[in-house]
Amino acid sequence: MQSFIAKQLQDHLALFQKMEAELTAPVAELAERLIETFKIGNKLLIMGNGGSAADAQHFAGEIVSRFRIERPGLPAIALSTDTSIITAIGNDYGFERIFSRQVEALAVPGDAVIGISTSGNSPNVQKALEVARQAGCTTIGLLGKDGGSIKAVCDIPLIIPSNDTPRVQEGHIAVIHILCDLIEQGLFGIFAGEGR
């Protein structure tokens, strides 16, 4: 059992070293885009299925409430939280539209819409990002594996370099926490007013 635990932790460390090498610049670019989204008065819409839905809710919670520093709340909505809306849309239009219908209702040009998918192939996430792009939003994917079909509909596809779903999920939550830190510092903290 201990050797299994050690192997899991070694795999985690190896992934994070790979992420440091491959994703530092893309995460910084994404943070800049999100900071600009909030600066111009727009909002963040976030979605995913299963564990990715939980990540979307976690991300929205940190943005609306706070991450590390006291600051004004920022507008972010997780599209996986309202069971009445999700089941109404699912019943009337089908599961594939549970997110896209919400994007149609809530998104305005300049918003940022983030789809989280470990496989990169969730049809309902892809459909929502397609709708978001047509609405003039920035489309972002937190993806895994090779980015799947969702990669093609993202202005910024951020792909965790792993084919193992638990590792991808660990990478996603690390990126989410880093983004929360950078957004807060960029708007209210040590990076505010800098040319970063």
Swiss-Prot record:
Substrate binds at N49, G50, G51, E62, N91, D92, S117, T118, S119, S122, Q169. The keyword Metal-binding applies. The keyword Translocase does not apply. Pfam families: SIS_2. Its EC number is 5.3.1.28. It catalyses: 2 D-sedoheptulose 7-phosphate = D-glycero-alpha-D-manno-heptose 7-phosphate + D-glycero-beta-D-manno-heptose 7-phosphate. GO terms for cellular component: cytoplasm. Residues 34-193 form the SIS domain. It is found in: Cytoplasm. PROSITE patterns: SIS (PS51464). Pathway: Carbohydrate biosynthesis; D-glycero-D-manno-heptose 7-phosphate biosynthesis; D-glycero-alpha-D-manno-heptose 7-phosphate and D-glycero-beta-D-manno-heptose 7-phosphate from sedoheptulose 7-phosphate: step 1/1. CDD domains: SIS_GmhA. The reaction produces a racemic mixture of D-glycero-alpha-D-manno-heptose 7-phosphate and D-glycero-beta-D-manno-heptose 7-phosphate. HAMAP family: GmhA. Homotetramer. Catalyzes the isomerization of sedoheptulose 7-phosphate in D-glycero-D-manno-heptose 7-phosphate. Belongs to the SIS family. GmhA subfamily. This is Phosphoheptose isomerase.
